[in-house]
């Protein structure tokens, strides 16, 4: 903030590397702590500091947390799922605290978007009603819309899902 001056937009999209699937009994303490440190703790503490900055400087700012469908249902990544569910609640708490100051806080939950080590699982595309995995070009315009004054001005405390419809599919059905 000292170097940039006024900050009006914050997007928390960081996440440490993870295995494709991992049961609750297989996650190590180090993996658990690393995931929560980046996804939950860092996001909250940065957003909290920026929220204070925005409030003190009367900045009508915007914050966006990139969460995940994993926040709402178990998908064999307990540390990732817990961190994303925590992000959703942090987003809602910040929206409630900062809304009276005109600061909007929302979340975007993308579906399966390959990249950063994510390759998907066999049969994944078969479980997506739109018949394909997402692309960054599917997600980015929605993030811009949420952050914009034109489309997102009356929106706070909300999670927008952009997933090709995969949330309609019960992941546990695939486990047989």
Describe every region a protein language model picked out.
Residues 6-9, 22, 54-68, 100-103, ...:
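Active-site loop of short-chain dehydrogenase/reductase
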Residues 13-20, 164-165:
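Conserved NAD(P)H cofactor-binding loop of Rossmann-fold oxidoreductase domains
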Residues 16-17, 55, 62-86, 91-100:
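Catalytic loop of short-chain dehydrogenase/reductase
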Residues 21-24, 28-33, 124:
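Substrate-binding pocket helix/loop in short-chain dehydrogenase/reductase
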Residues 47-48, 92:
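A short, exposed helix-loop element centered on a Lys and neighboring polar residues
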Residues 88-91, 98-113, 151-162:
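Conserved Rossmann-fold SDR core element
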Residues 136-162, 167:
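C-terminal substrate-recognition "lid" of short-chain dehydrogenase/reductases
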């Amino acid at each position: 903030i000292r170097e940039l001056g006024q900050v009006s937009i914050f997007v928390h999209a960081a996440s440490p590397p993870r295995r494709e699937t991992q049961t609750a009994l297989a996650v190590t303490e180090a993996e658990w702590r690393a995931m929560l440190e980046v996804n939950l703790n860092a996001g909250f503490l940065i957003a909290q500091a920026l929220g204070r900055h925005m409030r003190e400087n009367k900045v009508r700012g915007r914050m966006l947390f990139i969460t995940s469908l994993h926040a709402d249902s178990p998908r064999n990544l307990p540390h990732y799922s817990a961190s994303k569910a925590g992000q959703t609640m942090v987003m809602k708490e910040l929206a409630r605290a900062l809304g009276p100051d005109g600061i909007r806080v929302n979340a975007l939950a993308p579906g399966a978007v390959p990249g950063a080590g994510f390759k998907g699982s066999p049969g994944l595309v078969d479980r997506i009603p739109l018949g394909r995995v997402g692309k960054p070009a599917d997600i980015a315009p929605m993030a811009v819309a949420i952050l914009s004054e034109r489309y997102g001005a009356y929106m706070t405390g909300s999670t927008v899902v952009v997933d090709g419809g995969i949330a309609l599919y019960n992941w546990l059905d695939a486990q047989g």
